[in-house]
Amino acid sequence: VKSPRFGLNRFDSRSVDAFAADVRRAEQLDWDAALQPDSQLRRRDTYVLLAAAARATERITLGPLLANPVNRHPTVTASSIATIDELAPGRVLLGWGVGDTAVRLAGLKPARVGELEAGTRLMRALLAGESVEVGAARPARLPHHRPVPVWIAAGGPKTLRMAGGVADGVFIRVGTHPANIATAVSAIRAGAVEAGRDPAAVKLAAIFHTVLVDEPARALTMARSMAAGYYEYSPALFDPPALPWTGPDPETLKHDRNIWPDFHHAPDLEASGKAVDFLPVEAADAFSLRGGTGEVAERLLGALRAAPAAFDYVVLHPIPDPKWPSDPDNDYTARIAREVLPQVRKELEKT
């Protein structure tokens, strides 16, 4: 099994300088990618942060994960990411999707699959230096175009299939269960074939919510909240692993238990996890890695070995959200880098 490049998507964003320093620390700890959410009502401007990180680093891959075509027009995003690539040549990617929390918090609706597809085609053309008809007096062109790959983050079958047909790569966001991952990879490959593309040319990545909590009961509770978050937006993901949902509708639970904005982003993940204590352990383990570093490493290896294809990137999304300032020697960034990644890389080299 090929070892993927490991990415992190949570950094100290209390200031621009703090973000740049934290990404530099991640690079020194041998993380491969630093990816930043584009959520304007929760965090500082993504591209200002990435520009600062580009100046402070030499090797690590940088990019948004994820942007969307609702909060920023695709031409704006293409211009911004091309500018970042000027600062970090050849180590930038653009990760985007329909938009969930960032869009909903602004009172807007996530993009439709067709809108995301059109935006992807537009951005890839602009970043390749092509002229594109956009309904203006003249075709649009990006003077400072750069060859930045456009990745789509997706979990639903329609979006995955579309992504296989138009994107440079796909961040699969369906949890850790092999049945869901296999279903996602099949959809991506089918979309590539339909579009006349070589399926092997579409790069693959995975996003794994990683509950790094040493106390087993707390880790399980938070993992249940992660499972509920997936069900909340994509209930069909419970079908391939044949998992039950025997509780009330997620929206009813959120209202009755004061869970906001959703099960993935609730400030108190133990409280939100207890609200779905009817979920079996199998559901918790189908949508996240959990436990101490030893357990996380074992579960991560299992997920990678069971996957039907090799991943170029694996993003280990920290749960719960790190608190800043943190202990730089013992926080999530350091513990995963020191106690998980070397072991996983070594084991994968053997196979």
Residue ranges and their predicted role:
Residues 1-65, 148:
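N-terminal beta1-alpha1-beta2 module of alpha/beta enzyme domains
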Residues 4-10, 34-36, 61-65, 92-96, ...:
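Hydrophobic faces of well-ordered beta-strands that scaffold small-molecule active sites
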Residues 14-26, 77-80, 154-162, 293-305:
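Short, acidic/polar
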Residues 30, 53, 84, 123, ...:
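Conserved, mostly hydrophobic/aromatic
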Residues 33-56, 68, 100-103, 174-178, ...:
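Glycine-rich, proline-tolerant flexible connector loops at the mouths of alpha/beta enzymes
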Residues 47-67, 71, 126, 334-349:
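Alpha-helix-loop-beta-strand connector modules within alpha/beta enzyme cores
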Residues 109-141, 181-309, 347-351:
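An alpha-helical appendage that flanks or caps ligand/catalytic pockets
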